[in-house]
Amino acid sequence: MSGIQFGLMIRGQFPQGEDMGARFEEMVEQVRLADQLGFTSLTKGLHYSSHPLQTLNQLVFLSRMAAETRKLRLNFGIILLSLHQPLEIAEQLASLDVISKGRVIFGAGLGYREVELAAFGVQRKQVVRRFTENIEAIKRLWTEDKVSMKGSYFELLDANVSVKPVQKPHPPIWIGANADPAIERAARIGDCWYVNPHNRMDTIERQVEVYKRALDAAGKPFPVEFPGRRECFVAATREEAIRLCRPYLTKKYEVYHAWGQDKAMPEGDNDLGLAFDDLIKDRFFLGSVDEVAEQIINYTRKTGINHHVLSCQWPGMPQSMALDTLQLLGKEVFPRVRQGV
């Protein structure tokens, strides 16, 4: 296992009517603080047509953040790859890898929302084929001088990226996956499976075994870097943490439920419409410094995840609460975790 790493997930999702210019400045403050506190990576998610929330574009945001830090890796977590053409994505990420001096992580997933598929003219039955062909094409574009490849929905004729990425052979490819077949696909075509934030620990433990079997079948070793994302909030006590974050986490998961995220999750652990006290059971990192440290240690031991991407702010949450959690994580939780694992 690689040494333990911690990433900051900036969803950057805010209620309609909020001043996004002001919210952007707050996100910059969080990123600068994360860099100072020893976080390893910065993740920005991606959704189009994100009503009832508003958010900044992933590529634009991460490109801007490349100038705010010299250390944080820049994780596209995730690109809805089935909606796009491979040459476009290959060029965008290679360019940012050059600008950031080799800090890009290519996170990719299928997507699940009908509004996004329809807007990009993609039929649901096409999603998996588009995804796998795009991954293959992007790898080739990053590693070959000229690429000729006829996909089902694109054609490359002696095509090349205008600039190659700094990282060799290419930036790491993290494949986001919820269902077992998608995890098996991640083992075949990605550098690692990027574990979702929604499922209970027992589900993730079971799916890690699915992933290991798929790696064995593909003749691949378990990855040195194994990332997973989790919701996280730290306060003086668990009761206080739950009281403070309840309204904001509740709102976020109501939106997930309305968007249909449940449909992408495995049977038996696919109801994000649960009452809050049931939703948080064995699912999020919430509590005091000692409790959250122990939760992360336990999760690491049971799953093997060693790059924990933590989301610490949800729609409507004041900036001060997010900054307080980041401070507690960096100064108190992370040292305890590194000592305890």
Where do the model's predicted regions map?
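N-terminal beta1-alpha1-beta2 module of alpha/beta enzyme domains
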Residues: 1-69, 73, 168-171
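An alpha-helical appendage that flanks or caps ligand/catalytic pockets
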Residues: 2, 36, 125-161, 200-306, ...
